Amino acid sequence: MKAPAFWYAPPGTARPLLSALLTPAALAWTAATRRRLSGTRPWHAPVPVICVGNLVAGGAGKTPVVLDLLSRLRRGGLDAHALSRGHGGRLPGPLRVDPARHTAAEVGDEPLLLAAAAPAWIARDRAAGARAAADAGAGVLVLDDGFQNPGIAKDLSLLVVDGDAGFGNGRVIPAGPLREPVADGLARAQAVLLLGEDRRGTADLCRGRLPVLRGRLVPDPQAAADLEGRRVLAFAGIGRPEKLFRTLEALGADVVARLPFPDHHPFTAAELRALLDRAAALDALPVTTQKDLVRLPAELRGQVRALPVSIAWEEPDTLDRLLAPLLSGKDDHGQAQ
């Protein structure tokens, strides 16, 4: 689903009127969410659980953060596993993702990316997935999303916020992009990670309530160098496709076509062939995101370039202090105690 423009429209424009008309529905959504969160007794996993979540519908940059945390924890001696719902995949789980065997249509796109870096599991039932991962030897679990899922207790919840988008118009679905009121979410989290320039005053809103970590998404240097000056046809089916388009322009690429698709869009062979034909007609290189790449038909995937990104932390020491209690209690088998 594409986010309605009024979700991120500034005050004083005509579009917020539609948001106001949807306020009763937003109040009903909020009440239902609060009942669901308060009415469920969470299951406590036998290993620490770190949740990387957000408060808005759509993309915020969680997957690169999960990948970074998995790497940090594993470097610290913990057998860190990823756990995802497997959004967009048809298999309910719990099961461990095998990139050589599973497809995005089966397990979702994010789990395939995570499985390339660490053991990754999918499960519609997060508690069942956590049990399976712990039984398989996981020393700590990193949840990709799941902040609003009350079925499993979290030891550390990190809310990721896109600095460009912030919390949008500050209203709850369908009047705005929020999955729950900001105050409710901040009350259950331990820290906020603000990605990119703070264009919406998010840091001021969170200051005094939670630590605010800062970071930015950085393209792979070699990939960036290869794209400088190249004619590019850019396409993406992520929460905010325009982020890819702006990044490519900032790298010096000549973006001659920008093609947004719905989040988690399952590209068909016919669609991709049409994109490749259009790129050829424009004498352009087809470029997409890593998340989109794993959803492309395997037989045509090699004709598309992906732009890998990673997170650069402004104050990694603050993150290390948040993770320290998990790292300090590990046993000889990488289990956190």
Swiss-Prot record:
An example Gene Ontology CC term for this record: plasma membrane
Example of a GO MF term: tetraacyldisaccharide 4'-kinase activity
UniProt keywords, alphabetically: ATP-binding, Kinase, Lipid A biosynthesis, Lipid biosynthesis, Lipid metabolism, Nucleotide-binding, Transferase
Alphabetized Pfam families for the sequence: LpxK
Sites where the protein binds ATP: 56-63
Keyword Nucleotide-binding (UniProt): yes
EC number of this enzyme: 2.7.1.130
Xref: InterPro entries: LpxK, P-loop_NTPase
Catalytic activity: a lipid A disaccharide + ATP = a lipid IVA + ADP + H(+)
Annotated pathway: Glycolipid biosynthesis; lipid IV(A) biosynthesis; lipid IV(A) from (3R)-3-hydroxytetradecanoyl-[acyl-carrier-protein] and UDP-N-acetyl-alpha-D-glucosamine: step 6/6
BP GO terms, sorted: lipid A biosynthetic process; lipopolysaccharide core region biosynthetic process
Family stated for the protein in its record: Belongs to the LpxK family.
Function of the molecule: Transfers the gamma-phosphate of ATP to the 4'-position of a tetraacyldisaccharide 1-phosphate intermediate (termed DS-1-P) to form tetraacyldisaccharide 1,4'-bis-phosphate (lipid IVA).
UniProt-recorded name of the protein: Tetraacyldisaccharide 4'-kinase
Source organism of this protein record: Rhodospirillum centenum (strain ATCC 51521 / SW)
Taxonomic classification: Bacteria, Pseudomonadati, Pseudomonadota, Alphaproteobacteria, Rhodospirillales
